Amino acid sequence: DANGTPAIAADGRIRFDALTFWTDSGSLPPPDEDAGEVAGRDGRVVARGGAGQRTPGFVTGSPQEANGLGGRTIYYDRTSSSLGRLNVDVTTAAALQSDFGAATAAESAELIAFSRGLDVDDLDGDGERNEPRGWLFGDALHSRPLPLNYGSIGGYSDPANPAIFIAVGSDDGMLRMIRNTRAGGSDSGEEIWAFMPRASMGAQKVLRANGTGMQHPYTMDGAPVAFMYDKNQDGSIISGDGDRVFLYAGMRRGGKAYYALDVTNPENPRLMWTIEKGGDFSELGLTFSTPRVGLIDTATGPRPVVMFAGGYDVNKDKRGVIGSDDSEGNAMYVVDAETGALIWKARGGSGGGGGNVFEHAQLVDSIPSTLSVADTDGDGFTDRMVVGDTGGNIWRADIHGRDVSNWKLTLLASVGRHAGGAPSFETDRRFFHRPDLVPSKDGNGLFDAVVLGSGNRADPLDKGGSAYNFMYMIKDRRTSVGSGVDTGLQHVDFGDVTSNCLQSNGGCIVNLVHGWRLGLEEPGEKVLATALTLTGKTFFTTYLPFSGTGATACSPSEGAGRLYAVSL
């Protein structure tokens, strides 16, 4: 930890007496010793230290009602391509009244103040409202912190202390930019700015009410990704050199939108574009799919692009029923990284190829997964995307060449409810996570191993009547440009290695020409993460839900996890 002492306890969690690096130990509140808290330490208690404690105006002063007053700097999307200041003023309150769901402009102003972190309801009863609430950093439930290394800029001259900023989304409605260390080398963790899109403002009333029994609100819950371009490759991001840093983020269950910000200057963001459901993106569902960035070849040279799947349809939230076709989310997109303009998409339908839209009749299930992308011929351009959907189908999109009308979508395999026979709970397999794509070969030649596991992430605790889930390895032998012809492969076409017969001495024979499948035999066991293949071995984890409650009657059951290692 910050004091050089062991930070991790025997149970795998942070020790109560640990001090994290950004935390100011002298500014911590008195500990709750009954809960295990330690004086001068934040330890495993989230709402004591870290970046949350470093939020401007939290420890001293105030978050303030407006940017530029020594408190927080918060922006919102004034238009789809410009930022406004989220200030407590008459004009802003009136403009955002409907976005906040406020009955009056006065309530809208209160919700802006609440969003900025002010104690508008005097929760501590001291009569002061221009002070911080008890905690100002929402949960980063599914988002992941993204470190961005800007090198030697703005006073950061020591190579051992580059200018690193961290972007992360959270369910209080914000995408934050956090400073790692100061130019002099001391720890920071300070929030430089935050971005609250209009799409997440409606949740502020729920957060403010904080009522018993209210459902947890989701807002900016997606993991951000970045496109970084260091033109002269000097290790520093300097706008005058032609360098660029673009940041992209979705909302997962928080909404149906993607946002792109130019953060070439990490302290002065610019909104580049917004993609929302409608128009070219009429198929867009909840933006579960973390964007991928890459380059494609065009007549005018390399072109940066953003790639993502159509997202999640809440139709698949229904419990106790077999999955059915979705009305949104059944698509894949490639867009211009700088403008957000659609370059190509695949969607459900019977039209086939032509223009910048490819339709496939069997693309009827939403795709919450992040895409696996690849450069199959090593020319520096992304030319393939692979993904599974919530109907148990695995897809490959070939985006090779400059003519997008030749790009195509192929059904690699169908291992869920569509795979022959009447759909059943047992075959209602769903894919939520990015496949692991591994160039490989066997006695029949080269193939791309597509490794992915099934499991309904939207209902992780389900164990009764749930699908019999599997980990699959599919041998895709179209290692260069795909044919566009569906393989026809189904669940039964992959060798069943569940019994471990490949390691037995009994002469068990399994046909692995198309790949293999490994059954997850515990009730409700499911894959909830992407596999990793190293040196010919695939590692993956599973989740096992437990019945009953946790340590107390009101606490949840954590369940258990398993780690598997399987020879590819």
Predicted regions and their residues:
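Beta-propeller fold recognition
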Residues: 1-568
